[in-house]
Amino acid sequence: MAKLISRTEDGFYRLPAFVDAHVHVESSHLTPARFGRLIAAQGTLTAICDPHEIVNVMGEAGLAFMLEDAKRSPADLRFALPSCVPATPFETSGASLSVADTARLFAARPELIALGEMMNVPGVLSGDAEVLGKIAAAKAAGKPIDGHFPAGHGDPLVRYAAAGISSDHESLTADEALEKVAAGMTVFIREGSAAKNLAAILPAVTDGNWERFCFCTDDISAEDLLASGGIVNCIRMAVALGMDPERAVALATVNPARHYGLPVSDLDFVVVRDLVGFEIIRVVKDGRPLDASGPSPDSAAVANTVRLPDLSRHDFRAPGPKDGKLDVIGVTDGSLVTDHLRRDPSDTGDLALLSVVERHGKNGNIASAWTARTGLRRGALATTVAHDHHNLLALGNDPGDIRTAAAHLASLGGGQCVVLNGEVIADLPLPIAGLMSPCPAADVTAKANALKSAARQTGCSLADPFATLSFLALPVIPALKLTDRGLV
């Protein structure tokens, strides 16, 4: 392979522009245009985006918004067509996409680059007609199929990959990553906000298999992007952990481009100060210095998506013991994986109430359960970002504060907030589908940081409370989660 890193006349280092192999723009709470401006300034000029967050809320209207708004991004945002809308049968989403919809959209929108991550692993393995139909539609359109198989091992993994699924970003260990490579998959090494797996997986990359690895951020906040960067941070970390810079750059450039059949243009490149800190000196797109300016997005088409039932404090209570024990979601800070704990009813010292309220106006479902290890002792946190159905999710100690938080988010059209003693002490409005803000990254970050500080007043000890909270309703990642239909 030709060398990817060269010296510039002014003594710096020139690298190909970076590619994020898998990201959900909505997790940044930024619109595609604003997200693209931010990552482009950090050298990422291409990102493979799976919009299954907004499509689970708004369906095809949400997809259309993302594609249109992305046209104002200086980065090339390529969108996959979500495969799991809804993500599972165990939740209420705002929309659904059928096999016929999938085939029609691939035909109508040739710019769609892949079938988004196939989270319905049981459906693949059992030969579910809907799942296999979507895979067949992607194959007929000549599109790669992105995967999602946490803790994938053995014969189930081999069968999952053999169905035509060519990538996975859910590996937690080097051994898991190696098994996925052996099954024929490309492994995307994830370093995001809620899930940070790069250090654990990097030892799997060898002289014989490095072409089968890429970097991705998956779900990353605007504040993390501003603080340390996205893909440039992956390169920086990999080199600090001992990877050769040339190889680290390959995982961020030519490898994801090859996987998705994208060109690597000599006219798109990044100049960095050195091969340690990878400080960005300049970014060049189409042979010209990057222009990251642009108009503010129009978000009216995807506003007003929070439709809650009438609520009282009495709606928020957890079920009692079953067979003498409480079922409890054991939260692990910095991980998307939870534990299924069985607690004695007298052992409630560290428990907090988790509640999900259906917010799409479909059925008004409300479900609650106990969580452990969050540290929360008073007040409530609430969010309309709850993967992947994005119903309203609240964590609290006081049902009255939970009700206040839910009502406040409904008044904002979605977002995140902290309530203490009946008062909203911090919020982040997300009026675009209850997921995104029309504001610039710096404004979103300031609000998000204020939320984190406010969350500390509840006793919450999680490093990124709202990022962790948003995954407590995602049943496709084990072991115990809560949706509007109950514990899964």
What is the meaning of each model-derived region?
Residues 58-62, 88-94, 126-130, 156-160, ...:
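Short acidic, glycine/serine/threonine-rich loops at helix termini
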Residues 7-8, 40-42, 226-242, 246-488:
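Active-site microenvironment of metallo-dependent hydrolases
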Residues 96-116, 123-188, 195-215, 226-240, ...:
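Histidine/acidic residue-rich metal-binding segments in metalloenzymes
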Residues 33-142, 425-429:
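Divalent-metal coordination cores built from histidine and acidic residues
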Residues 24-30, 52-54, 82-87, 118-122, ...:
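Active-site beta-loop-alpha junctions enriched in small/polar residues
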Residues 22, 43, 66, 115, ...:
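Divalent metal-coordination and catalytic microenvironments
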Residues 19-32, 86-100, 163-166, 170:
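Active-site mouth loops of central-metabolism enzymes
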